């Protein structure tokens, strides 16, 4: 492993040797003609995994969300979304620019949810004065936070009662599934009358996939990113019904997302689904190690991580010194992002030694 410790994002990962081998030997065709066997296999694989009829391989998560919103909505429609969600805040206003679909952003509760009462209040009446509310978009995880399953069920049921479609930006869906599987295991172990002694046993692959599917099945469409924690170099998938994916396919073409011998990339994504889901638990453990290592440092508040993202807020004297922190870390081969609010993301190219180096460097800078 390189001596550099890059904690900026889980998008910085390099393909593993096994992933590179899968890419090198992937059978190829022309996906614009629908003839790339590796792309077709990946689309079938992720659709079946999450319980959908079909899926579409796209270059980016931004394009996946754009295809989803424009497939659910028409010009003059709107979608309800959170202020901090990627498809509102970080995607250049694409749905409004390209589709004349306006967002109706809502404030998040501290746990990342959109209050149910706020969602209901945002749904417009059938009146020519208003944009037509067509879609509820959620993100899980959001800023590394796992949305409670009960909330996901309630919010999507509310949307369904009002005739809204439901889309999940599941860029880190499998991080959510790993965290949820461990939470479900803990609840079972702690339940009255339980005789289980497996509270520390690693959850199985089947348990994680079951939780991913459980989350996904609350929605009409789901976007999954392969190039974050799963470690593939490029690509996302959009899952939904066959009719929905046919609409999304047309939008992908208009957005320039059709690729030719894309099986090289699809093979990397398929390898990640087979080999990199379970290891996400290691990233979560490293995030906890980082958070625990910074706990108690004066002027530093650390949010307990749900998954692989750690947020750190600086106060008082630590805040006054914040401008020099990232250069100090960079001089020691450690990269992160932020100023007064720092973000650290663990991934497959970071190990415990790297996390410990980062902790020591931060504590040393602040005199801890």
Label each PLM-derived region with a short phrase.
Residues 2-185, 205-350, 358-367:
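Conserved PLP-enzyme active-site core in the AAT-like
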Residues 185-189, 194-205:
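Intrinsically disordered, low-complexity segments enriched in serine/proline and basic residues
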